[in-house]
Amino acid sequence: FLIGIWAAPKSEDNVPLGSPATSDLSDTSCAKTHEALKTSRNIDQHYPAPKKAEDQEFGSAANIIVDPKLFQKRRFQSPRVLFSTQPPPLSRDEQNVDNANSLNRNIRAKREDHPVHNRGEYSVCDSVNVWVANKTTATDIRGNVVTVMVDVNINNNVYKQYFFETKCRNPNPVPTGCRGIDARHWNSYC
């Protein structure tokens, strides 16, 4: 379940790819709400607006200006939705490849990288995490289909909106039932 600045997936949690609930997941899994974003047409001399409405592309950086103070508000910050000029790394390991030395890490840092998996909590499938930037429409937290902005102009820099998605690597992780369910005592389907 993706909750963030402007995002929430349309499908149910832990539904494998290829099922009816996720057939259009790549196009509609993230969103922006119209109330959250304060946009305005730029009428400044440095950024002239297009003459005709037909010439304008909705969401292009040339005609959407966002107040940078909007991103300082805590309710609009999310680890799953990001505005950036370049794609973010997928994990903490990729961020610290150059400057991380495994000998200098403390025990707590190692424990966070390798969580304990024997606590009775199992994922329904092996997951794949990706950052997606090519969204055009999505479903917001309230269930409304909204249009996602292509580019955003913040302080004269063009930013893209990236959404963090988690999907199942294999649509059927186990032959029968759900992974992590005791088949001797429970009937399940995924």
Curated annotation (Swiss-Prot):
Taxonomic lineage from the root = Eukaryota, Metazoa, Chordata, Craniata, Vertebrata
Quaternary structure and interacting proteins, as annotated: Homodimer; non-covalently linked.
Source organism: Agkistrodon contortrix contortrix (Southern copperhead)
Please give the PANTHER family that the UniProt record associates with this protein: BETA-NERVE GROWTH FACTOR (PTHR11589:SF10), NERVE GROWTH FACTOR NGF -RELATED (PTHR11589)
Q: Per its database record, what is this protein's job?
A: Nerve growth factor is important for the development and maintenance of the sympathetic and sensory nervous systems. It stimulates division and differentiation of sympathetic and embryonic sensory neurons as well as basal forebrain cholinergic neurons in the brain. Its relevance in the snake venom is not clear. However, it has been shown to inhibit metalloproteinase-dependent proteolysis of platelet glycoprotein Ib alpha, suggesting a metalloproteinase inhibition to prevent metalloprotease autodigestion and/or protection against prey proteases.
One GO MF annotation is: nerve growth factor receptor binding
**Localization, UniProt:** Secreted
One GO term of the biological process aspect: cell surface receptor protein tyrosine kinase signaling pathway
According to the UniProt entry, the coiled-coil residues are none
Q: Which UniProt keywords apply?
A: Cleavage on pair of basic residues, Disulfide bond, Glycoprotein, Growth factor, Lipid-binding, Metalloenzyme inhibitor, Metalloprotease inhibitor, Protease inhibitor, Secreted, Signal, Toxin
Q: What is this protein called?
A: Venom nerve growth factor
State which residues form the propeptide.
8-111
A GO cellular-component term linked to this record: extracellular space
Q: What is known about its processing and modification?
A: Glycosylated.
The yes or no answer to whether the keyword Disulfide bond is present is: yes
> What PROSITE patterns does this protein's entry cite?
NGF_1, NGF_2
